[in-house]
Regions:
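Hydrophobic/aromatic residues within well-ordered alpha-helical segments
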Residues: 49, 60-64, 85, 89, ...
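Hydrophobic alpha-helical connector segments
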Residues: 55, 59, 69-95, 154-155, ...
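C-terminal peripheral helix-coil segments that are non-catalytic and often amphipathic
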Residues: 91, 132, 136-140, 160-193
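Amphipathic alpha-helical packing segments from all-alpha helical-bundle domains
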Residues: 62, 69, 113-144, 153, ...
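Amphipathic alpha-helical segments used for helix-helix packing
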Residues: 93-118, 167-168
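Flexible coil/turn residues that form the inter-helical turn or adjacent wing/linker of helix-turn-helix
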Residues: 24-25, 147, 174
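Helix-turn-helix
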Residues: 9, 13, 17-51, 55
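N-terminal intrinsically disordered/low-complexity leader segments
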Residues: 1-5
């Protein structure tokens, strides 16, 4: 088994365990058992459970922003970009709602203790830089009022609004309604020229 394969097995097992249990309920023994990888090997790749969960969060968010950057590159039409990003979130939610549940669960659990709170704040700063790159790629946006706003602020606001709908529902054990996400797209489309 190659190193990448072992690391992927560990991450996949962690994804499944964190889906079923909270971060604090999950153990490295659970992950070792499910992945078939010995615990010392897990610690070789991930010195702590916090490091493992952080890597998992980072990979999920990185994939989201890579896809958003890909969408932005496909068209210069702002309204089309908005529609495509909202559609991407809807498809991701329908195909893999587990991703959002894990992100919400780990994020919430991390904020409960100082040691993990520091780690997640470092991670959010790193991810914010990825989001800024996508926002810079988005380019300046002219609002319907005529005011210009950076693509970074516009994209940040839209992603935050979509995330709020998704995570609020996930936290309540509900699946977000497609129409609620479409409304966010409509609001942002109406806000641009």
């Amino acid at each position: 088994m190659g190193n990448i394969n072992k690391k992927e097995k560990i991450l996949e097992a962690a994804r499944d365990i964190f889906f079923k249990k909270s971060f604090y309920e999950a153990t490295m023994d659970d992950i070792a058992l499910l992945s078939g990888v010995k615990k010392p090997t897990i610690y070789y790749y991930f010195p702590s459970k916090i490091d493992l969960a952080s890597q998992l969060l980072e990979l999920n968010v990185k994939k989201i922003f890579e896809k958003i950057s890909e969408i932005i590159s496909k068209t210069n039409n702002i309204k089309q970009r908005i529609k495509m990003i909202v559609d991407f979130y809807i498809n991701l939610l329908e195909e893999n709602s587990k991703t959002f549940i894990i992100m919400q669960r780990i994020g919430y659990d991390f904020m409960q203790k100082e040691d993990s709170k520091k780690k997640i704040n470092e991670l959010f700063e790193k991810l914010r830089k990825k989001q800024k790159k996508a926002g810079d790629l988005f380019g300046e946006v002219i609002l319907s009022s005529g005011k210009k706003v950076s693509g970074d602020i516009f994209l940040y606001s839209m992603v935050a609004a979509l995330g709020r709908i998704i995570f609020e529902n996930v936290a309540q054990g509900r699946k977000p309604k497609k129409n609620d996400l479409l409304v966010i797209g409509d609001i942002f489309s109406a806000s641009v020229k």
